[in-house]
Swiss-Prot record:
It comes from Prochlorococcus marinus subsp. pastoris (strain CCMP1986 / NIES-2087 / MED4). This is Polyribonucleotide nucleotidyltransferase. One of its GO terms (molecular function) is 3'-5'-RNA exonuclease activity. It catalyses: RNA(n+1) + phosphate = RNA(n) + a ribonucleoside 5'-diphosphate. Mg(2+) binds at D495, D501. Its cofactor is Mg(2+). InterPro entries: ExoRNase_PH_dom1, ExoRNase_PH_dom2, ExoRNase_PH_dom2_sf, KH_dom, KH_dom_type_1, KH_dom_type_1_sf, NA-bd_OB-fold, PNPase.
């Protein structure tokens, strides 16, 4: 078997491409490699057309643990349902590819990216996006490409192209920029409160690199002798479109200008007009051109009616500067926010509403053992902040089965999670595991940004000391020729009929998350820059409204939340606390009814619903790890009697032995003649032997006083009730 090997030198690295060797029955296939990361990306188109009004595109990303030299856990030792990470990468591939296929295409297309080997220095996701473009070009599928993606990081003042996982963690920015020859088509970013200007410069830096990869793909096609298939729109019978334009333009236009109408009223009136048109056409003679045309395609009337509505709405925005609800282009919908709306058995709760979009967010405080273990190719082994987003059918007035979260719900949850993560307190300050759930109760655009706002409010209500509150808004765009209008806080119909959905989240200081999706084939950086700048006053306005509901963390936690104490011990003494076979730590947890977690670095976290019990456990652990020195005097309690002496607890959990010869200046025949179990005595540390055993004495020690137990200084991370 022979294939063609080519390479691209990019940012000082070699990207290796192998074509014509793998997956010979796929429409197009490429093995794309950089470092030790290898992905096989395929693109296949069927000739079977779907009777749908959308492009039936499926993008899948598969990663098997053998790519990192690991065997899956679980009884079956086999990969199961794709992890969340795989779903997010599949979406990352889908989002820049979808707008580059012609809107009229109805052929089934499937792109599959399989990670066969993973190098931690070379993340697989952006390679998969670029590989999807190459595979599609090789399959000769009509496509407004080439398209490519790069990741940009920021360490200090320097932008880094395609940083490693470690560099991403160290830096203040993680942004993926995807683009076509016409401009940027997708952005996905997380940032540490980065300024708008720095963010714009990062996008510009990324698109310059994208342009290099686009040229490299064009050269690859020339080398392989493949001519790119440019989309050629098929001729359609315009009779129905002409009929609708003549008969429906005026009534639709009147509806779109009823600015005081609710969404429901507007939708009902538009549906009524569409139904009247359907009835008129159905009443025509069987040989009428319109009836023949619509009988062959039952969805044609709905599709063309939607196109006309879209055209009129866009024209109103471009020519009159007015939106369907009467707002100006830069106006935010009415906002209401409230915190603490549920009983305190829910640790934190909030309700955020913007227009008809309403989100209920809840926060649960968990212990370190509640962290999510990651069994995928992500170098991180656990997550301590989880955001789950739910979109039930009733939120849009529909009915459908409620099953497991779909790709959209996973993606929106990840976006909200990314927006909040930079402002979370450090684990030494607040070592709780946090789970936020955002329930979309009503949807009319920008529910993910509603989730960001609701999350901030519920976290503050739970008493989480955020570094700063976060708000978010969705920006839209209408582009007709050279005319461009940017919309602030888009609602559902503007998202559906517009050209861009650009979500911007951040604090007063700067941006924490971006997500931009397009329905056109690209936008210049200048337009993206304008949208980012216009989002700032909207974000700050929303933030002001949120702070009217709650502007700082609650001073006390819910009485039903666990209480945590966090402190540090010498890592070399972790074994002392755990004890042989875990007996010591098990004894402490059983005695105090607490949960104890110890990290390799020596950070101990004690969880309990009883603050006094947590303090008792801390005293025991600090007693076990406190270094005892010869000559120190301690008050103690006799815990055991043996023939040759008595054991005395001098610190919580730490015992020493008084040999029978050290019980008194005089000769002692029986230990019980001097002390009994439970007696309080004062002892001096006589010696610590080579095995670390503490030998004590009562000789020469006054028994009417002495040192008291040393009181450890607790470092509580939450108020103790």
């Amino acid at each position: 078997m022979e294939g063609k090997n080519t390479s691209i030198t990019f940012d000082g690295r070699e990207i290796r491409l192998t074509t014509g060797l793998y997956a010979p029955q796929a429409g197009g296939a490429v093995m794309i490699e950089c470092g030790d990361t290898s992905l096989l990306v395929t693109a296949t188109k069927t000739t079977k057309k779907q009777a749908a009004d959308f492009l039936p595109l499926i993008c899948d990303y598969e990663e098997k643990l053998y790519a990192a030299g690991r065997i899956p856990g679980g009884f079956m030792r086999r990969e199961g349902r794709p992890p969340e990470r795989a779903t997010l990468i599949a979406r990352l591939i889908d989002r820049p590819m979808r707008p580059l296929f012609p809107s009229w295409m109805r052929d089934e297309i499937q792109i599959v990216a399989s990670c066969l080997s993973l190098d931690e220095r070379v993340p697989a996701d952006v390679l998969g996006v670029t590989g999807a473009s190459i595979a599609t070009l090789l399959a000769e599928i009509p496509f407004y490409g080439p398209m490519a993606a790069v990741r940009v990081g920021l360490i200090g003042d320097d932008f880094i192209l395609n940083p490693s996982y470690r560099e991403i963690e160290k830096g203040d920015l993680d942004i993926v920029v995807a683009g076509s020859p016409e401009g940027i088509v997708m952005i996905e970013a997380g940032a540490n409160q980065l300024s708008e200007q720095d963010t714009i410069e990062a996008i510009d830096f990324g698109y310059e690199a994208v342009s290099e990869l686009i040229k490299a793909q064009e050269n690859l096609l020339k080398d392989l002798g493949i001519k790119q298939v440019k989309p050629l729109e098929p001729e359609e019978d315009k009779a129905l479109a002409t009929y609708l334009e003549k008969n429906c333009t005026k009534p639709i236009d009147l509806i779109l200008k009823k600015f005081d109408q609710s969404k429901e009223e507007r939708d009902l009136e538009l549906d009524k007009i569409e139904l009247e048109v359907q009835t008129k056409i159905d009443s025509l003679k069987d040989d009428n051109q319109l009836k023949v045309l619509t009988s062959e395609n039952e969805k044609l009337i709905h599709s063309d009616f939607k196109k006309l509505t879209k055209k009129l709405m866009r024209s109103q925005i471009i020519n009159e500067g007015k939106r369907v609800d009467g707002r100006d282009l830069d106006e935010v919908r009415k906002i209401s926010a409230s915190a603490g709306i549920l009983p305190k058995r829910v640790h934190g709760s909030a309700l955020f509403q913007r227009g008809l979009t309403q989100v209920l967010s809840t926060t649960t405080l968990g212990t370190p053992s509640d962290a999510q273990e990651m069994d995928d190719l992500n170098p991180s082994t656990e997550k301590t902040y989880l955001h789950h987003y739910n979109f039930p059918p009733y939120s849009v007035g529909e009915t459908r089965p409620m099953r497991t979260p779909g790709r959209r719900e996973i993606g929106h949850g990840a976006l909200a999670e990314r927006a909040i993560t930079p402002v979370l307190p450090g684990k030494e300050t607040f070592p709780y595991v946090l789970r936020v759930v955002s329930e979309v109760l009503s949807s009319n655009g920008s529910t993910s940004m509603g989730s960001v706002c609701g999350s901030t409010l519920s976290l503050l209500d739970a008493g989480v000391p955020l570094k700063a509150p976060v708000s978010g808004t969705a920006m839209g765009l209408i582009k007709e020729g050279k005319e461009v209008r940017i919309l602030t806080d888009i609602q559902g119909i503007e998202d559906f009929l517009g050209d861009m959905d650009f979500k911007v989240a951040g604090t007063e200081k700067g941006i924490t998350a971006l997500q931009m999706d397009m329905k056109i084939t690209g936008l210049p950086v200048s337009v993206i820059s304008d949208a980012i700048k216009k989002a700032r006053p909207a974000r700050l306005h929303i933030l002001e409204k949120m702070q009217e509901a709650i502007d700082k963390p609650q001073e006390s936690l819910s009485p039903h939340a666990p209480r945590l104490l966090s402190f540090r011990i010498d890592p070399e003494l972790i074994g002392t606390v755990i004890g042989p076979g875990g007996r010591t730590i098990k004894g402490i947890t059983e005695r105090t009814n607490t949960k104890i977690d110890i990290e390799d670095g020596g950070i101990v976290t004690i969880a309990s619903h009883d603050g006094a019990a947590a303090e008792e456990a801390q005293k025991i652990i600090e007693g076990l790890t406190r270094k005892v020195h010869e000559g120190e005097i301690f008050p103690g309690v006799v815990t055991r009697i043996i023939p040759i002496g008595a054991f005395v607890e001098i610190l919580p959990g730490k015992e020493g032995m008084v040999h029978i010869s050290q019980l008194s200046e005089a000769r002692v025949e029986r230990v019980e003649d001097v002390v009994r179990q439970g007696d309080e005595v004062t002892v001096r540390v006589r010696e610590i032997d080579s095995r670390g055993r503490i030998n004590l004495t009562l000789r020469g020690v006054a028994q009417n006083g002495g040192m008291s137990y040393p009181e450890p200084t607790p470092t509580p991370v939450a108020p103790l009730n």
